[in-house]
């Protein structure tokens, strides 16, 4: 049963976001992830703490508007994405770039 719960939590966190701003936030022990748009803050916090074995002190989320896209004469939208910025407790860290 615990494995099913871990799998459900793993589906909440899609991928880490690596941008200039996200890299700057790493210096303040803040990590940025793309998450499921339907996930709530408690679910996101539980997923990060369970998957990475860290303590999340603060969590903020952003749900930016969808961008319109056009392919030829067909108009559409990009997929809805939600970003979460997690601030970790002092001494905790997540290895996003493993040593080669």
From Swiss-Prot:
Domain of life of the source: Bacteria
Entry-linked PANTHER family: 60S RIBOSOMAL PROTEIN L23A
HAMAP family according to UniProt: Ribosomal_uL23_B (MF_01369_B)
Subunit-level organization: Part of the 50S ribosomal subunit. Contacts protein L29, and trigger factor when it is bound to the ribosome.
Lineage: Bacteria, Bacillati, Cyanobacteriota, Cyanophyceae, Synechococcales
Record InterPro entries: Nucleotide-bd_a/b_plait_sf, Ribosomal_uL23-like, Ribosomal_uL23/eL15/eS24_sf
Name of the molecule in the record: Large ribosomal subunit protein uL23
Keyword Ribonucleoprotein: yes
Keywords: Ribonucleoprotein, Ribosomal protein, RNA-binding, rRNA-binding
Organism: Synechococcus elongatus (strain ATCC 33912 / PCC 7942 / FACHB-805)
Protein's job: One of the early assembly proteins it binds 23S rRNA. One of the proteins that surrounds the polypeptide exit tunnel on the outside of the ribosome. Forms the main docking site for trigger factor binding to the ribosome.
């Amino acid at each position: 049963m615990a494995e099913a719960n871990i799998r459900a939590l793993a589906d909440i966190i899609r991928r880490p976001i690596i941008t200039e701003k996200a890299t700057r936030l790493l210096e303040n022990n803040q990590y940025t992830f793309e998450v499921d748009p339907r996930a709530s803050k408690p679910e996101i916090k539980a997923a990060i703490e369970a998957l990475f074995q860290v303590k999340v002190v603060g969590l903020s989320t952003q749900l930016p508007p969808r961008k319109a896209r056009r392919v030829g004469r067909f108009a559409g939208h990009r997929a809805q994405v939600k970003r979460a910025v997690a601030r970790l407790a002092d001494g905790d860290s997540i290895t996003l770039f493993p040593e080669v």
